[in-house]
UniProtKB/Swiss-Prot annotation:
Name of the gene: HOF1
Subunit structure, interactors included: Interacts with INN1.
Coiled coil region boundaries: 134-200
Span of domain F-BAR: 1-261
CDD domains cross-referenced by the UniProt entry: SH3
Any further remark recorded for this protein: Present with 195 molecules/cell in log phase SD medium.
Pfam family, one: FCH
Protein name: Cytokinesis protein 2
Compositional bias of kind Basic and acidic residues: 381-391, 397-413
Originating species: Saccharomyces cerevisiae (strain ATCC 204508 / S288c) (Baker's yeast)
Key words of the record: Cell cycle, Cell division, Coiled coil, Cytoplasm, Cytoskeleton, Mitosis, Phosphoprotein, SH3 domain
Function according to Swiss-Prot or TrEMBL: Throughout most of the cell cycle it forms a double ring that coincides with the septins. After the onset of mitosis, forms a ring-like structure which colocalizes with the medial actin ring. Mediates cytoskeletal rearrangements required for cytokinesis. In conjunction with the medial actin ring exhibits contraction-like action.
Gene3D superfamilies: Arfaptin homology (AH) domain/BAR domain (1.20.1270.60), SH3 Domains (2.30.30.40)
Residue spans of biased composition, Low complexity class: 421-431, 445-455
SUPFAM superfamilies in the cross-refs: BAR/IMD domain-like, SH3-domain
Amino acid sequence: MSYSYEACFWDPNDNGVNILLGHISQGIRSCDSMILFFKQRSELEKDYARRLGAITGKLDKDIGTNMDYGKLNETFNVVLSVEKARAQSHSKQSEILFRQIYTDTKAFAANLQARYTTLSGKIERLRMDKFNKKKGCEVLQKKLQDAQIRFRDLQLNENNMIGAKRVEHNKRELLKWESNSQEYKVQLDVLKQEYKASQKFWIHEWAQLSCELQEMENARISFLQSKLQQFATSSMETYILEQTKMDMLTNHLNSFTAADEISTFSKENGTGRLKHKTSKGDMNSSANWAQMSSISTTSKKTESYMDNIRKLSSQLKETENKRKLASIDKYEKPLPSPEVTMATQFRNSTPVIRNETKVVANPTLSLRSSPVQLQSNVDDSVLRQKPDKPRPIVGEEQLKPDEDSKNPDEKGLMVHKRNQSLSSPSESSSSNPTDFSHIKKRQSMESMTTSVSSMANSIDDSQRFAKSWNSSNRKRKSMSHLQVPSSASSRSDDGGRTPNSAHNLNEDDYNTRRDTSTSTILFKPPVAVRGTSRGHTHRQSMIMQDSSNPIEDALYEMERIQSSSKPGTKTGNIMDERGVVRDRGITVTLPIVTSEGFPVIEYAKAMYPLIGNEAPGLANFHKGDYLLITEIVNKDWYKGEVYDNDRIDRNHRIGLIPYNFIQLLHQGL
């Protein structure tokens, strides 16, 4: 079904005619608004072009009087040409607006008004003719009824008259009203026929007139669309020209620096140079040479470090395969319980794995400050008999072995060369941060560390650790928890202190902590309970000796450790650190929960105001207000609360916050 003026404005009382004529008249009056807009806009563009031309002329005169030097003077000339082009563009736009848009729209609106006046007058005449004939029919019908009633009364009183004169008068009246009734009846029949004819003519004429009104409205809308499109095109041409000129100016500004200008002027207009002493020149060249050699040494160390990592990875895989295949060994040797740390640091934009061994092997650290007493019941002879235990590999990701295709002889030669390179004091401390060969009697601990590291690196983060470990262990970033014995004497002391430490530590103190910001995993194995003999193992391994799937065993053990940890003391220090942000160098303390009790995950500051928007669920705020972010909806929207602004209604103080209106604040002092 199609809708049009010709088909949708028919009714017995002609109400549709009034509605349609009012709509057409309102549209014509709206044209006057656009005519006034185009006129004022053309005057504005003309005045802007005139003023800009005057400013440009003054700038041209000043540049000619006070000339700058070099590239900056060329930049001034570029600015002058850009502004001249801008003034010409706006002058052209003013002419287009006045001559092509304003004038044409004004003439079209006048023609439209004249056409509407003609059509509306014709419609009114037709409607009036139809109305008059209808009204005449009603009047004649009433007269006919009155004449018929009078004739009937006279006819009834004809036999009741006394006297000849009265009878004669009654007859004359009877004949008169009878003739009047006949005449009214004939006139009424004729007028009814004329009224029916006027109705038919109105229907025919209204169909044509409504079609003409529809064509007139269509022409008005199309004309205004074309003129507005012409206005948009002329404005866009001006804006594109301005953008092009501004890009040219920007490129010219980026083509030189202040140092270039100073150097050029000094070169072309310099009058003499000071002679520098040779020693100072030698010193500068020596400093440059030292810097270049330092960079070369760093790159060589990085390459050496990567080679060491690859070699250790190959040794690790080979040792793991031997352990799995060796089913003869039915017991697990008791190992000390160091805390295994995997950390990553970025130094000078180069990934470097932090050497945790230096902290561990520091002789100034005593066993009294360590949170866990190290225990070992392995004698020195057993430790010396297994020198080729794999060393721990510490890092954010364990590198894949790249030497699987080599034969056993080449691998043995590589291991021998690796042991020789690690035995030198210079390489043990700086070349490979993961090497522990310079620390004596560490084979058992290194074996345990290597097995845990290899398994931990092969398990996905999302399967191993819950997100709650992030908040519970951020406060344990300090390296003061890392402390292991570094000499044979400390090992012998551990053996003597094992019973005491077993009484002081609980069996359930088996905590696993992970800090995602530094990729650190800390394992605290349980201490043997009272009554355990020295010959038994003091540490429960995360993997069973004859396990066919060590990764699943390690995963199960980690989940059990996580579920047994106490969550009550995990968020204390983290909540203390939150609420303190930096705003333009000023420390600001904000609440860590909203007024409704929701925890705050981010803090932000409003860079632009968002006021007066009555959309439901949208927060309103002023520029400079602090915002408490409680939820990140997506990359474009946050959800939160406006902090401490009573000028905003309560219904719009909490809701959605657009990301491009705010700036996130960094936490911490």
